[in-house]
From Swiss-Prot:
One of its GO terms (molecular function) is ATP binding. Homodimer. Forms a heterotetramer composed of two Mre11 subunits and two Rad50 subunits. HAMAP family: RAD50. GO terms for cellular component: DNA repair complex. Residues 380-478 form the Zinc-hook domain. It comes from the Archaea. It comes from Saccharolobus solfataricus (strain ATCC 35092 / DSM 1617 / JCM 11322 / P2) (Sulfolobus solfataricus). PANTHER family: ABC TRANSPORTER ABCH.3. Its cofactor is Zn(2+). This is DNA double-strand break repair Rad50 ATPase.
Amino acid sequence: MRIDKITLTNFLSHEHSEIQFMGEINVIVGQNGAGKSSIIDGIVFSLFRTHSRGNNDNLIRKGSNRGSVTLYLSNEKDKIEIIRDIRSTTEDRLIRNQFPIARSATVVSNEIEKILGIDKDIALSTIIVRQGELDKILENFQEIMGKILKLELIEKLIDSRGPIVEFRKNLENKLRELDRIEQDYNNFKKTVEEKRARVLELKKDKEKLEDEIKNLEKRIKDIKDQFDEYEKKRNQYLKLTTTLKIKEGELNELNRSIEELRKQTENMDQLEKEINELENLRNIKLKFEKYEVLAKSHTEMSANVINLEKEIEEYEKAIRRKEELEPKYLKYKELERKLEELQPKYQQYLKLKSDLDSKLNLKERLEKDASELSNDIDKVNSLEQKVEETRKKQLNLRAQLAKVESLISEKNEIINNISQVEGETCPVCGRPLDEEHKQKIIKEAKSYILQLELNKNELEEELKKITNELNKIEREYRRLSNNKASYDNVMRQLKKLNEEIENLHSEIESLKNIDEEIKKINEEVKELKLYYEEFMRLSKYTKEELDKKRVKLDEMKKKKEEIEKEMRGLESELKGLDRKALESKILDLENKRVKLDEMKKKKGILEDYIRQVKLLQEEVKNLREEVNIIQFDENRYNELKTSLDAYNLSLKEKENRKSRIEGELESLEKDIEEISNRIANYELQLKDREKIINAINKLEKIRSALGERKLQSYIIMTTKQLIENNLNDIISKFDLSIKNVEMEIMPKTGRGRSSSGDILVYTNSGDTLPIVSLSGGERIALSIALRLAIAKALMSNTNFFILDEPTIHLDDQRKAYLIEIIRAAKESVPQIIVVTHDEEVVQAADYVIRVEKRGNKSFVREET
């Protein structure tokens, strides 16, 4: 799998860069700080989502909110696209042959490892060589191999503080816990047996009590039946005797009442004879009363006749006056009608006059405004030219200020980068950079910044002055422009207003006669108004109403004559009678009549009481017979009641004892159930004892198998041979005096450190040399060959090799040697990517990518 292309969007100094790797040896060349290594950072971030820049936000280009990297890889079968979003892990995607197969950071990383067979630790230690780390693999060979082969992880597993020992300790703690559980298990078994024995004892007591309760309930039932029968008799006896006493009392009371009523009704016949005369006397009294009513009606009727005669006289007088006023009333109504007809035109006339006054006032104001505005019109054109010239000056000053600020920002960034440099090597170009040189660069930059700041202050002051002047001119220009528009508007309004005023004059002239006519009519109405109001007051007096009153007067006179005739008839009938003596006699008879009515009522009550006495005497006789039949004995009743209460008390005591036993039984059974559940739970836990013992033994065997003499030795042995074969095969393709190389990889010791191990080199002349005896060029060649050999052995699907600034610290001779090695290495790896600032390395390339920085952005161009 080779790298085809990478796209960087807002990544470090790259805003949007698309880099294609079309050759076997691809060289990325550019000045220090141009953004070359950022491309390698992008490849590493795409593959493993890792970097050495601290927080992920540090990868996003300054001034941007988001950033992303897309890496394209391919082989004969597949095309892979890896998309990484710098800020959001959920947006990461993996696309295979244009089909999405994974999403989110972790899933994408796992899938990349499966498909490409790339392990992060191996890749970063072998095929991706960071700046200054080319021969680090020779210096730290044992440590790097331990990391690559995961020997450190195996050692951590079997360490005395590792997870295997920790897990074994946990299992041993569980065994000790099971010993404690077994002791509790035996104690609980003993307790449950004791409780079960107590349950059996209580159940026997309960059965005995249930038999006793059953016998008692039977005895109580027998006595209760007898008592209920006697209770029934007693209730019947008490009911009858109570009723008998009540009836005897009622009988005695009735006899006393009968005797009293007989005395009170002795003179009833005599009273009836006297009262028969009362009706005749009453009729005479009614005639006296009727005469009084007729006399009163006669008096009232006479007064009404006199009043009605006066009213008729007034009516006749009012009607005559009404007839005199009617012509003036009709004249008044006619004038009112005429006023109503003229009113719309008169209102129109008033409205037109009001409109004319308003428009004349408006015209006066507009003429005044037009006079004032005409003075500002000539100034607009000259101000317009002045605004344009001042704006150009402002834009020029802003451009100069932006340029100065950009230069200040660049110098501050240089100072910041120099201040953060650790050691005496420039991180950008790799050249020597001692403290004196650093301070000199910083001093020069600060001096330049000071000069720029002074320039900036002058520009800002001048810009502020120009801006204030422009604002002032623009405000005046806007005011005058608005005044010109206002002047035009005022003139249009005046023209329209003059036309409207002329029209209003014409309309008012046509309606002028209406005003005079209205005034004349109002004067006539004023003269007739009093006559009109008097006529309206007399309008209620009509001839029809007068005729009705005359008819009514005739009827009243006729009625008066009838009353006089009836009064004369009654006077002849009542002649010689004394009304007061008559009324006294009637009153006495009325009192006797009331007394007679009371006697009649008492007579009826007396007869009813006599009937009730007969009935009560019969009831008393029957009740006495029923009492004799019952034969109730109070002593026998009390004897049965006492016996029943005693048996019920005994039954209640036994039932209480039974309830207490049942409560204790329920509690015991609940305890037994809970303890049995705990026993069953303990039995399940105790079954695990054998499994735990077996697990402890197996853990010891696993720990032993993972030790340095077993699994580690096996991994080293199988890997070592494969790497050596690959290494010697690659070296044979280089033009070196090395015949063969052997490696010694040692397992991790129990103390967590690697045992001694080494790389031995056999020369063509038969000598055996350690690494330290090799020349600089041979060390470079061996480092590259060893990295490729390890990668080929452990990552069979990886076909690229990346070198970041491999020429750093190399002299010209070694650089030339490195170029030859890179050319030779392409026989072992199909794709090599080299990042460098040395133009000499371009000689080895068949595809060149140039990177340069403009301002704070990196730009890429490709050369074939």
